[in-house]
Amino acid sequence: WLALAAAPAPVVTLAISDVPGDDPAVIASGPTVPDPTTCAEALAVLKRYAIAVPDAVRTALAEGRWETPKPDHPHFARCRYHLIATPWESLAAAAEEARRFGFAAHILSDAIEGESQTVAQWHAALARAVVCHGEPFCAPCVLLSGGETTVTLPRKPADPLLPARGGRNSEFLLAL
C-alpha cells in the first residue's frame, strides 16, 4: 500500500533481509512491493486449521475487501527493488569481525527454522561438544547462525488478563 500511496512518484526500495529466502513480500511485510497472496488464500488457511474469526472478518475476506495490490498493478512498473543485504552477508560480516579479534568463526546456517526452545537446545548441545570434546570445532570459537524461529503459545494462557511478554529471541536465550 505504501507504494500506491506514493503514486505517481517512482519508488525505490533498498531492503535488508532478515528472513530465510529473502522474499521481498515478506521482508518488513513488504510495504513497497506487490503482494502475491489473496484473500481467498487467507480464507483457505482459516478453514484448513479451523480458526474461528468474527463473521465480519470472514465476510471481508470473502468479498476481497482487504485485497492488496498484485504484481500486475500498473504502479509497480515505476517501482524498483534492490536487496542490499541478506542474512548470509550479515553473518559473514560478523564472522569477519570475530576473526579480526582472533577468534575462529563458523557460520552454521542462515536459514535455521523451528521452535525457539528446540533450536536453542541444539545450539547448546553444539557449544557443549565444542567445549568438552573440541568437536566439530576447536574452542574457543564463535558460532553464528540466523533464521526464523517460532514460539507456540498455549491455547489457554495461565492468566488471560496478563499480556504475553518476550518473544522468539527471549525464548531462545532462556532455553540456551
Task: Indicate residue ranges for each PLM-predicted region.
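Short acidic (Asp/Glu) and glycine-rich catalytic loops that position anionic groups and cofactors
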Residues: G21-V26, K70-F76, F101-A105, S145-L153
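Accessory alpha-helical/coil subdomains and C-terminal extensions
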Residues: P8, V12, P34-W122
